[in-house]
Structure formats: C-alpha cells, structure tokens
Amino acid sequence: MERNYRKTRVGSVVSDKMDKTVVVAVEDRVRHPLLNKIIRHTRKFKAHDEKNECRIGDKVRIMETRPLSKEKRWRVVEIMERAR
C-alpha cells in the first residue's frame, strides 16, 4: 500500500500516559437518515508517538500504518496545534 492511499484523520489527544503511545479522539459528524439531525460520533484510536512529543489537548494528524501492537494501527504524523 502506498503512503498516498493511507487513511488520515485529525483529532485531539485525550491520553498520553503510555510510553510512545497516545489516545486520539476523532470526531465525525453524520446526518441521521430519519431525523435529519447532525450527530457527533467520537472514536478513539491508539497512535504511535515515537518521541513522546504529544500532550493532552494537542490537535494531531494521524495516519494508518501496519499493526504495531494489539490495538495500535495508527501513527502521529504531525502536531497541528499545541494545547494551551
């Protein structure tokens, strides 16, 4: 699989307690087919952070990668915005 075709997501870091791993919450907005109401779906991904740079509240871009552990299939590409 080429890097160009890998999925990317933008989310915020909700946990950085693990070594070289962060939990990123990604929010999707979907329209309910019957109610026509916008609903927020939040999914959490474990992402690889090689240098332990991410902190809670940072806005990051993650990219799909090969399985790195039992639950880790994403890696942090860039920190888009630092938490205040």
UniProtKB/Swiss-Prot annotation:
Q: Which domain of life is it from?
A: Bacteria
Instruction: List GO molecular-function terms, semicolon-separated.
Output: rRNA binding; structural constituent of ribosome
Indicate whether RNA-binding appears among the record's keywords: yes
Recorded hits in CDD domains, A to Z, give: Ribosomal_uS17
Keywords, comma-separated and alphabetical: Ribonucleoprotein, Ribosomal protein, RNA-binding, rRNA-binding
Spell out the GO cellular component terms annotated for this protein, sorted alphabetically and separated by semicolons. cytosolic small ribosomal subunit
Among Pfam families, the record links this protein to: Ribosomal_S17
Q: Name one GO biological process term.
A: translation
Which InterPro entries does its entry note?
NA-bd_OB-fold, Ribosomal_uS17, Ribosomal_uS17_bact/chlr, Ribosomal_uS17_CS
Q: What does this protein do?
A: One of the primary rRNA binding proteins, it binds specifically to the 5'-end of 16S ribosomal RNA.
Assigned protein family: Belongs to the universal ribosomal protein uS17 family.
Describe its partners and assembly state: Part of the 30S ribosomal subunit.
Cite the NCBIfam families for this sequence.
Answer: PRK05610.1, uS17_bact
State what protein this is by name: Small ribosomal subunit protein uS17
